């Protein structure tokens, strides 16, 4: 067994060297490492392999992290991510490196790693990092009770503000609009971008995810949305801006809002305020975010086992859960699209797959499902919409992909384009909720697993427990025309739930319930 482990380490070394030299042999070494790794896994010998790695590399946690991230990139086995998690919690690595690595881990989780079910460990790591950051910044301010705050001011925090086609950005802007225009709040938006990436840190994670942001918003900014002006401030959360963080805390505390409302994923900056005022944290995905906020708000709740575990943990920490029945109003397309616009046959049964991370989400497991679907009938075709840079290589993998799929590219008017489809297929992933809602609005049924954002737009009986169930449901949609028509009519019911009056009333109810929890 030791010989196998030694051989596996040598394979990994060859692969890394080939990648550094941009050698054409890199894929060969990658395949060899993957094959030998999976053999060890099947023989239940991975513990010995990782113990060997710990004994050889744990003295240099950054190099060790890099090696583990390479392993994950090659084999996509969550075990390597668990090892990084443990390393982060027990090494003496500097704080900013820890934050950077944690953000890479969370990106892997969002991209559908099974590690996403380990909510408690993620929370413990977040609290550990938050405590270190608080000690580093060292702000001494007293907590201000709600009765002494300005009841007509709200500060919203977010980690990324892009264009209106970016679903989280649109959610934030819609909420800003209704808070200002209908509830007459004074709203200030703080965009705190977690971007610890620099030349040194790039050497501790293989193929790191990079945060995208609009540089035009740096510093103070004003954006117009509908007839409202939204004022805000954007800064980069990195080692060069720790002074800005401290200054912003003092400015915002003097601004004295009724509460801080964080939207999105984990945000150390927003959590810093929990010692001075009330913080409410709300993710854009299913369940609850990673936060030490006093109030944990959710508007997507699939009630899966994972979410139930989150809620149990909130009970243990004393954090207060809050349900927000967020139903953003939908604006129909001003244009009518036809299949001929995209060279799609009118007689085909077209299944669409929509996303801005299709390069990652169309993985081997999902490709197998697509092959099975396309073999049901020659009348079935698949249309990808979004960002899929690897589509040319995807269609070269199999003739059935090259002849029976199309890539429509990124579509600004997504709600209009989805009207020409027959079915919306959601890959195993956390996101996809926006595209699913647009499909339902057009009367296009949705096929999805039951533990993701998309599931929140469907009745439980219309979701699937497994990939195999998804395949069976697609077959039923294709063959059973009566069932398809019934589900199409059911999909259109979403229009009744997406008016401005519903948005207003549900937001009013949530704000009233939130105030009751403040003190």
Where are these regions (language model features)?
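N-terminal subdomain of nucleotide-sugar transferases
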Residues: 2-44, 49-56, 83-87, 91-216
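Active-site-proximal region of nucleotide-activated glycan assembly enzymes
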Residues: 114-124, 276-333
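Conserved catalytic-core segment of nucleotide-activated headgroup transferases in glycan assembly
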Residues: 166-177, 304, 315-397
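Short acidic alpha-helix that forms the nucleotide-activated donor recognition element
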Residues: 246-250, 410-422, 441
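Acidic donor-binding loop of glycosyltransferase active sites
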Residues: 255-259, 419-432, 444
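Catalytic binding pocket for nucleotide-activated donors in carbohydrate/polymer assembly enzymes
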Residues: 309, 427-495
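A charged, aromatic-enriched C-terminal amphipathic alpha-helix characteristic of glycosyltransferases
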Residues: 336, 342, 479-519
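Nucleotide-activated donor-binding/catalytic signature segment of Leloir-type glycosyltransferases, i.e.
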Residues: 392-411
